[in-house]
Structures are given as structure tokens and as C-alpha cells.
Amino acid sequence: MARRGTEAFPDLGAQCDREDCNQLDFLPFDCDGCGKTFCAEHRTYRDHGCARAADQGRTVVVCEACGDAIERRAGDGGGDDAAVLEAHARSRRCDPARKRKPRCPVPRCKETLTFSNTSGCKGCGQKVCLKHRFPADHACAGAGAGAASKAAGAAAAARSAGQCGRDAQKKEGGGWKLPQSVRNMKIF
């Protein structure tokens, strides 16, 4: 049983159960193997030399075919990696098609497409990453329609600029042209 807290605050924290430590820790860790209380320095099975660590440890084996991580439990007989992988291969959960993640089809782009960074092109219907979402960035097959819409947009911008009287008077340098009478005025 761990000694709890101090005389002033008996419910605050606990002392480490390791014999050579006995440090008062205000956020102690309870070991799920041996049931003792330990400080942050001795919280792992290896750090406090837990006798029941083998019962509580978790190990996984990664399937080369589908990329899944299969947990190997000590209570299941333990088995070696080959037996665990063989059982996984016989199950219906092993699907080699899942291992290969979709990638952006743009040459030299190595971006993996996920739900949050995938954009579908309206011109060609290709799924590309966000860096290549514009038709000019991914050599869109429907770029002819994109070029026509760009030309239409430029024509509309030119019409709206021509309708505004102020824009017609604007100089190339960015300033406004003053009427001749104001330019000749002298200020004393």
C-alpha cells in the first residue's frame, strides 16, 4: 500500500513504491501489472522491474501485404510472428489493395490524397492535391473550356472598366489626371 501525501495534506499525491526512491509525487502512476504506485521516473514496467510485465505488454506485427498492424496478445498463446501473420492472411481483413494509398497524378508530385487534401477538377474530373487544384497546375484535359472561361472573364472585366468614367482618366502610373485648369493653378 502506497503511503499517501504529507501530514498537512494526506490525500495529496503518493510516494513511489520503489524501495530506493520513495519520492513524493503529486501525480502518481498506478501500475496495471503489479498494482503498485510509482513516480514519473519509475512508471514503466522496465523502470520499476515489474514482475507481471509480460502479462500486460502489447506487441504488434505489421502485415506486409495490407499494412495492417495486428496485435499479438500474451494470453492468446503468444505464437510467433509467422503464425500471427498466417492467421491474419486467412482472415477476410487482409486486403492488399488497401495498402497502396492514392497519390496525386501530377508528375513529380508525391502528395498522398486524403479526404482533407483532395480536390476534384471540374474540367477533367481528376482527383488532385490542393497544390494542383487549378486547371493550369495539372495540365487539365478540359483546359479548352477553362481557357474560354478565362477569355470571357477578361472581356467582362474590360467592359466594366470602360463603363466607369474615372478608370478611363486614370494614368498608367496609378495616379489621377488633373484637369488642365487645376494643373496650371499656382499656390502662394
Curated annotation (Swiss-Prot):
The keyword Metal-binding applies. Zn(2+) 3 binds at C104, C109, C129, H132. PROSITE patterns: ZF_AN1 (PS51039). Zn(2+) 1 binds at C16, C21, C39, H42. It holds the Pfam family zf-AN1. Gene3D superfamilies: AN1-like Zinc finger. It comes from the Eukaryota. GO terms for cellular component: cytoplasm. Zn(2+) 2 binds at C31, C34, H48, C50. Zn(2+) 4 binds at C121, C124, H138, C140. InterPro entries: AN1-like_Znf, Znf_AN1. Keywords: Metal-binding, Repeat, Stress response, Zinc, Zinc-finger. GO terms for molecular function: zinc ion binding. Induction: By cold, dehydration and salt stress. A zinc finger (AN1-type) spans 10-58, 98-148. May be involved in environmental stress response. This is Zinc finger AN1 domain-containing stress-associated protein 17. The lineage of its organism: Eukaryota, Viridiplantae, Streptophyta, Embryophyta, Tracheophyta. The gene is SAP17.
